[in-house]
Amino acid sequence: MKHYKIIDGSEVRGSDLRLPRAISIYRAALAHKQVTVKSCRRKSDGSEVIIMELSRLEIPDEPEFPIHVKEDIAVRCLKEDLNMPEVYAIRKDFPIGLPHSNAMPFAHPVSLCISDVLFADIKPQFNAFDFINLIIRWFNLNSIGELHEKGRPLEVFFQYHNFCG
């Protein structure tokens, strides 16, 4: 796995995570049948990163976009917890420019926009298991070209804290 500055940090055990959002996602990932937790990290800014492998993704034999049946992702939770946890596809050759990818000042890792709902609107009822399922849904639907509604213009956002439609 390639190292990316945005998710690099000191490796920590999952049981040593400190941020409530990271802890809930870590625990949900451990219980999820399609997820294997590979590692956890703490960055110098206090954010925490969970590296996971998603498996048994529902990818057709000839996908619309080159998405694999297994994909590695990183979920980064910020200390302030004001925005949706950041989700990155961390495969070295993961395609850029897919629908519902966030425009960032770097090409890789690819930042995924997994929800078009503002985090402030869902934060009170945030469910880590549902969050993981949204990520899986992103891969499954993008692989068949159905993540983005037909006839709806793509919206480009240049900051991960915005939402995409």
Model-predicted regions and their roles:
Residues 95-152:
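Glycine-centered motif in EGF-like
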Residues 1-66:
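Long, charged/polar, low-complexity intrinsically disordered N-terminal extensions
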Residues 39-115, 126:
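Compact alpha/beta protein-protein interaction domains typified by the UBC
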Residues 158-165:
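Extended, non-transmembrane interaction/recognition domains
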Residues 152-158:
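A glycine-rich phosphate-binding loop feature that marks nucleotide/adenosyl-phosphate handling sites
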